[in-house]
């Protein structure tokens, strides 16, 4: 089967049943304060702000997201943290404009598998981590014992072409070896898995539109950044993430 590999923020061609896209299907509601590092990357349109991707706080003033989420000037973005519900004000929300951002120098949106799909965002205002609603994730150089199940957190759609859920979603997924992941994607043009990727899979559960850039964690250890998956959000293919431990040294220089 041949398919066009795409990372999508908003829309897909209706006729392409096997295109590639990032976001969460088959998840459940997260509790308040359960994932305090989860953020929303938003873009301004007129006087309003709209969620386009996830992000993850790793210091009080820096966050990570997927490089493919960023194409405009830094001033067109803001980050929101402490947001459990997208359409409600819970009183725990904190927002900051973006001073600057840096995509990985070897990111290539035209290459198969979208290698090096990671970016650093610098916040204008540091986040207040005195409450349980907002706080940075722990990021270690290796994945420790995170070899089986991990939590994926998302603010994207719960089904392709459905509306975004109001509540932050989570899903428990199984980690695959990269060899197994590559085999499951065989036959899909452009679906290349490399050492800078980590894959998770659970039948009927998947990333979906709007989840790009969001975190994959084991406990409070950041392991992956949502990069790409199947656009139908069917849960029939693995979801592919940027393996953050592969980029530890680069991020520390930013």
UniProtKB/Swiss-Prot annotation:
Signal sequence segment: 1-18
GO molecular function, one term: serine-type endopeptidase activity
Active site (catalytic residues): 68, 117, 212
Domain of life of the source: Eukaryota
Regulation: Activated by an autocatalytic mechanism.
Cysteine disulfide partners in this protein: 53-69, 146-218, 181-199, 208-233
Keywords from the UniProt entry: Disulfide bond, Hydrolase, Protease, Secreted, Serine protease, Signal, Zymogen
Expression sites by tissue: Expressed specifically in the distal quarter of the intestine.
SMART domains the UniProt entry points to: Tryp_SPc (SM00020)
Gene Ontology, cellular component aspect: extracellular region
InterPro entries found in the cross-reference section: Peptidase_S1, Peptidase_S1_PA, Peptidase_S1_PA_chymotrypsin, Peptidase_S1A, Trypsin_dom, TRYPSIN_HIS, TRYPSIN_SER
Pro-peptide region(s): 19-23
EC class: hydrolase
Stretches assigned to the Peptidase S1 domain: 24-254
Family recorded in the similarity comment: Belongs to the peptidase S1 family.
Subunit structure: Monomer.
Stated name of the protein: Chymotrypsin-like serine proteinase
Organism: Haliotis rufescens
């Amino acid at each position: 089967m041949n398919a066009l590999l795409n990372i999508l923020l908003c829309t897909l061609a209706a006729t392409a049943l096997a295109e590639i896209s990032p976001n969460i299907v088959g998840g459940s509601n997260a509790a308040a304060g359960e994932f305090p590092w989860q953020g929303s990357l938003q873009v301004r349109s007129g006087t309003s702000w709209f969620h386009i991707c996830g992000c993850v706080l790793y210091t009080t003033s820096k966050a990570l997201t997927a490089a493919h989420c960023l194409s405009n000037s830094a001033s067109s973005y803001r980050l929101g943290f402490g947001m459990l519900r997208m359409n409600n004000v819970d009183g725990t929300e904190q927002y900051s404009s973006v001073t600057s951002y840096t995509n990985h120098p070897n990111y290539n949106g035209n290459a198969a598998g979208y290698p090096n799909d990671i970016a650093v965002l610098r916040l204008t205002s540091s986040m207040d981590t005195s409450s349980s609603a907002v706080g940075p994730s722990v990021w270690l150089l290796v994945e420790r014992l995170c070899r089986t199940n991990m939590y994926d957190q998302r603010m994207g759609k719960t089904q392709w072409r459905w509306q975004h859920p109001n509540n932050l979603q989570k899903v428990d997924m199984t980690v695959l070896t990269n060899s197994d992941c590559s085999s499951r994607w065989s036959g899909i043009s452009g679906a290349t898995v490399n050492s800078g990727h980590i894959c998770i899979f659970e039948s009927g559960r998947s990333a979906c539109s709007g989840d790009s850039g969001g975190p994959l964690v084991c406990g409070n250890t950041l392991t992956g950044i949502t990069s790409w998956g199947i656009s139908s959000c069917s849960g029939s293919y693995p979801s592919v993430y940027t393996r953050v431990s592969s980029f530890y040294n680069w991020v520390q220089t930013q």
